[in-house]
Amino acid sequence: MAEETQHNKLAAAKKKLKEYWQKNRPRVPAGVNRNRKTNGSIPETATSGGCQPPGDSATGFHREGPTSSATLKDLESPCQERAVVLDSTSVKISRLKNTIKSLKQQKKQVEHQLEEEKKANNERQKAERELEVQIQTLIIQKEELNTDLYHMERSLRYFEEESKDLAVRLQHSLQCKGELESALSAVIATEKKKANQLSSCSKAHTEWELEQSLQDQALLKAQLTQLKESFQQLQLERDECAEHIEGERARWHQRMSKMSQEICTLKKEKQQDMRRVEELERSLSKLKNQMAEPLPPEPPAVPSEVELQHLRKELERVAGELQSQVKNNQHISLLNRRQEERIREQEERLRKQEERLQEQHEKLRQLAKPQSVFEELNNENKSTLQLEQQVKELQEKLGEEHLEAASQQNQQLTAQLSLMALPGEGHGGEHLDSEGEEAPRPMPSVPEDPESREAMSSFMDHLKEKADLSELVKKQELRFIQYWQERCHQKIHHLLSEPGGRAKDAALGGGHHQAGAQGGDEGEAAGAAADGIAAYSNYNNGHRKFLAAAHNSADEPGPGAPAPQELGAADKHGDLREVTLTSSAQGEAREDPLLDKPTAQPIVQDHQEHPGLGSNCCVPLFCWAWLPRRRR
């Protein structure tokens, strides 16, 4: 009975052990391994200590030594087998942990590489944005420079047209002045002849003067036609200049269109690159999300081969994705390099354009200097035109007064001739014959009648008024000449004192022909200054020769000069020879070589009154020589 109870107890204990092992499988191997490593105890004792039922102490099972030792020996063999299995599984688990750690390290390295690539992409994007901003600023600067160039060209054309108009007006005014001087000289010569030959005045002489006036009118009409033709030629030249400027504008528009097309292509390429970068960023974000997903918890049991294969496939997939990303990054880097090369080429083009624009700015600045001088000259030309208008008005007044005086003199002469003819009618034919013989005398004897005396006094009063007006005209002409003398000296000094001293070198070397290609507009201005100085010196030489001839011939009285007895009263109030502007178109005045020039006697008088003008004379109009040369 005792043996049967023992066997029953052993069977119950085995069942309980099996149930216990089935319930606590993952805990038992770990405890066994720990007991092995730390204490070095036998697994049997551990199992027996861990598997002892709670009721054995009460039943007295542990008191029976031989029976319990036998059962423990029987249980030792499966426990050892299970310990070996647990050792193999622990080795596999450690290997898997090592692989997981290596994968984590690879993951960290890949994330680090991705972060570096992202930083590089961000830096590239920043550089591209900066380049876009620079390109936009350069485009804006280019547009501003183009507008400035357009306005400067318009202002230059406007100033050139104004200068042409002023030059034409000055020439026309000078021609009118010469014509008025010739007309005045002709009128004064006729008045002298009338004063010298009161008896020889007749209807034939007046008709001859009318014919001459008609001829003068015909000449004036011919001159007007010539002026109209020259005006038409100037208009044609202006049209040609306008066509040339339109051609240049078309070229500039073509260049701007090409630049705009290139900028559009660059913008399209940049948009494509931005799209690619966004796609890459999306792929990177997806990968980060995949990497950031929580790992599944560690399996409580040993992972199977299926799970290992799944892990290997995932690793291969991740490696393939990384390789594809590396290839994409390489492709993006190549595209970025190409874009950088294109941007560099565009920067070089922009630099070249900036250099060209800077050169144009320098040229415009150099042109602005003579423009300021040219504006001053325009203002001075306006003032001279005003002075000339005043001179014209005075001359017109003189002409009207001369005509009125001539008509009055004709009436007085007819009255005197009628009075002179009355006493000769009562003495018969002998007196008529004597009058016929004495008719060709140059000067008849002036009767001492009161009417003739009144006529002579009125004539002398008219001469006094004429002398006063001529003195006013001469004063204004002297002011005009002195003013132009000072301004011409200042302008020549300004041209000679330009930066670089090129004007002086050009003046010594022969104008703008030796200024060279490097001089540019400065060489042209220097050549203009040299030409102006040469013209100035030639004018001085000719003027000195003219003054010398005038001094030599001033002492010799001309054949058409009035007698001193008749013009004694006029000499008291002013020399008539100083007032009159003798013309080469009237009678005996053509014999004197100095009287061929309408302004001979006033120049002699100016030289006598102002001796400084002969040594340092100036040209009344300082023409700019560089304006026509710039067209060439």
Curated annotation (Swiss-Prot):
The keyword Coiled coil applies. Residues 427-440, 569-578 have a biased composition (Basic and acidic residues). InterPro entries: GM130_C (IPR043937), GOLGA_cons_dom (IPR043976), Golgin_A (IPR024858). Signal peptide: none annotated. Residues 508-520 have a biased composition (Gly residues). It holds the Pfam family GOLGA2L5. Residues 85-150, 209-421 form a coiled coil. GO terms for biological process: Golgi organization. It comes from the Eukaryota. Keywords: Coiled coil. The keyword Coiled coil applies. Residues 38-50 have a biased composition (Polar residues). GO terms for cellular component: cis-Golgi network; Golgi cis cisterna; Golgi cisterna membrane. Residues 1-76, 423-452, 505-524, 552-612 are annotated as: Disordered. Belongs to the GOLGA6 family. This is Golgin subfamily A member 8O.
